[in-house]
Amino acid sequence: MNPIVINRLQRKLGYTFNHQELLQQALTHRSASSKHNERLEFLGDSILSYVIANALYHRFPRVDEGDMSRMRATLVRGNTLAELAREFELGECLRLGPGELKSGGFRRESILADTVEALIGGVFLDSDIQTVEKLILNWYQTRLDEISPGDKQKDPKTRLQEYLQGRHLPLPTYLVVQVRGEAHDQEFTIHCQVSGLSEPVVGTGSSRRKAEQAAAEQALKKLELE
């Protein structure tokens, strides 16, 4: 891997790996090698959830469990992680197999999000929980400062449904139009038809549910509710 690109990535992350092989593994998609990042992703997912839950618990002492769960879901969902990945310019650092490279895998939100979680897992193994917690809180500082409890933290499908029901309009319909990839690494494309929009909106994700949520979020943006 290009040392200049890797050094730039570590500067953007705010962390330099002591064991560079952990960084390489975190950046390796399963399409590229048998030593890929999925186990690190599993670890990082749990660490991220803990760090964000702990931060919300102490920031919002009077907020109930439901609102805290919704805020956490907003902060750890795939498109938020993909936003972080783009801020880190992570796409050009990924190690992908030929098929994923050809299909633009370095832009896929699910791959970008999974890689951020793998990096978290890698940093934890390379250091300790205190270091990775400090790093995550630094990445999330602005988002944690801006987030607040309330209806906006409901997931996009729920908000879209409530908006339409409140206006006595038909509920949205979701249609799977494409499924790409092998069983262990699929990408779903969903068309969502919404009353008031002339064309269906499109969402993609690593599961049908995630793709539907992404489509609903696009619909909310087109309805200028996001």
Curated annotation (Swiss-Prot):
Induction: Expression increases as the growth rate increases. Encoded in the rnc-era-recO operon. Processes the 5' end of its own transcript leading to mRNA instability.
GO biological process: mRNA processing; regulation of gene expression; RNA processing; rRNA processing; tRNA processing
Effect after changing E117K: In rnc70; slower growth, loss of RNase activity. Dominant over wild-type. Binds ds-RNA
Binding site for Mg(2+): E41, D114, E117
Record text on activity regulation: Non-competitively inhibited by 2-hydroxy-4H-isoquinoline-1,3-dione. Activity is down-regulated during cold shock by direct interaction with YmdB. Also down-regulated during entry into stationary phase by an YmdB-independent mechanism.
Binding note for cofactor: Divalent metal cations, preferably Mg(2+). While only 1 Mg(2+) is detected by crystallography, other evidence indicates there may be more than 1 metal necessary for catalysis. Binding of the second metal my be promoted by substrate binding.
EC number: 3.1.26.3
Pfam families, per the entry: dsrm, Ribonucleas_3_3
CDD domains per UniProt: DSRM_RNAse_III_family, RIBOc
Top-level taxon of origin: Bacteria
Catalytic reaction list: Endonucleolytic cleavage to 5'-phosphomonoester
GO annotation, cellular component aspect: cytosol
NCBIfam families hit by this protein: RNaseIII
Family stated for the protein in its record: Belongs to the ribonuclease III family.
Quaternary structure and partners: Homodimer.
Protein name: Ribonuclease 3
Native species: Escherichia coli (strain K12)
